[in-house]
Amino acid sequence: MRFSLSTTGLQDWNGDVLVVGLLQDQPATDLEARFPGLGAALAQQQFKGKPSEQLLINRLGNNGPQRLVVLGLGPANAFNLDGVRSAAARAAKAASGHTGSLGLQLSWDGLEPTAAAAAAAEAARLALYADQRFRKAPEPRRQPEALELIGLPATAAAGLQTVDATCAGVELARELVAAPPNVVTPAALAETAAELARNHGLELTVLERADCEARGMGAFLCVSQGSDLDPKLIHLIYRPDGEVKRRVALVGKGLTFDSGGYNLKVGAAQIDMMKFDMGGSAAVLGAMRSIAERKPAGVEVHMIVASCENMINGSAVHPGDIVTAADGTTIEINNTDAEGRLTLADALLYASEQKPDAVVDLATLTGACVIALGDEMAGLWSNNDGLATALQQAADAGGEGLWRMPLRASYKEGLKSKLADFKNTGPRPGGSITAALFLEHFVGDGIAWAHIDIAGTVWSDKGRGLDPAGATGYGVRTLANWICNPE
């Protein structure tokens, strides 16, 4: 899909599908002037401009668009960038079946034009995403080839420049999360990183099992013991032209399948969906795709993924085993289904060795976070208020729900082991907090760190807004915004 600002106004636009948004109780004066009789049609349908309302009219004559769609936008005082995204996603879906141009006019007043243009274009493209890779005969899809935004000033065009890069990263993350575990393996994630390196001039190092053993990564490696697939620690680097003013590390959980190990997932644990336990790695790989295309100046980005499967065989780690992380910390495993934090422990230690100013990890880590925040908000824990604020702003700008959670030090008592330095899980209450506290231990001194738990947001069963049902690609927009727009 191509994106542009329309050079004509509503009265003169003559593309294929025209979508116009009306605020609640807003008179349809401009529409009535262009399409006489439309006001009566809206009145007949008792159209009030509520967010759920939509009126579609086909065949408006020889001189008009083939389809007109009027969307309700809700109250004026509640219409914001999230409203733009929702309306643009609805507009794109309403234009399905037409391969020409889609014109979109919303209520842009009070919105920053550049941000509004970016929000609308990203939502329109992402809402039409469909994954048909695994079908014998993919269904033909007719979609608009171009989106023209009507009524925005010329300065808004700057917001369209990064849309393709952002959406490409989100779509890569969606593809990785949605693919089955016999397709997306640790080796496949490493190959995805290799392809990014080849296509975008990035640097890649992949540590094999022997390399990880030499580094003493016992926490990571113990998780992989039950699998026939070799683990991979993937290190992808973006280096900017010119001076490096800051260095950051993105760490993603990369469990390509999680059976739970001997603490086998049963019942509501949805073992059949545990292909998405590598959602953190998908997010950071997708972010690297976007970052590599946008080429931010002055920032060096290290992406680290410790990838493996958590399976069961005669060599699998037992409940009660004690393992040693790369820094010598000993961990008593009281739950083999709390494996993600073990892989992240060694990944965070490795990330800290790169001497970053900040480390951000993303992981489908705890069901407790889903209970607390649902499936539209990810949880954020951080040891640094400035970093937490920057990530919150980046998430807000990208339309991704993020909520800061407490990092209460006293809860760390629940991780104490009688035999080792730590247990890998604490008591049930506050489980997402103790998980974050466990990770914090493995971050180097003086490094700003944040942990984002995406267990609820990585997948949408029914779809919502610009996210179709399935993998959402959550986290890519937040990370890309944080790194590329540091101000």
Curated annotation (Swiss-Prot):
One Pfam family name is Peptidase_M17_N
Keywords in alphabetical order:
Aminopeptidase, Cytoplasm, Hydrolase, Manganese, Metal-binding, Protease
Q: What highest taxon heads this organism's lineage?
A: Bacteria
One cellular-component annotation, GO:
cytoplasm
Its cofactor is: Mn(2+)
E.C. code: 3.4.11.1, 3.4.11.10
Quote the record's cofactor note: Binds 2 manganese ions per subunit.
- The reply to whether Manganese figures as a keyword in the UniProt entry is yes
In which compartments does the protein localize? Cytoplasm
- PANTHER family the record matches: CYTOSOL AMINOPEPTIDASE, LEUCINE AMINOPEPTIDASE-RELATED
Functional summary from the UniProt entry: Presumably involved in the processing and regular turnover of intracellular proteins. Catalyzes the removal of unsubstituted N-terminal amino acids from various peptides.
What protein family is recorded?
A: Belongs to the peptidase M17 family.
Q: What is this protein called?
A: Probable cytosol aminopeptidase
**Can you name the source organism?**
Parasynechococcus marenigrum (strain WH8102)
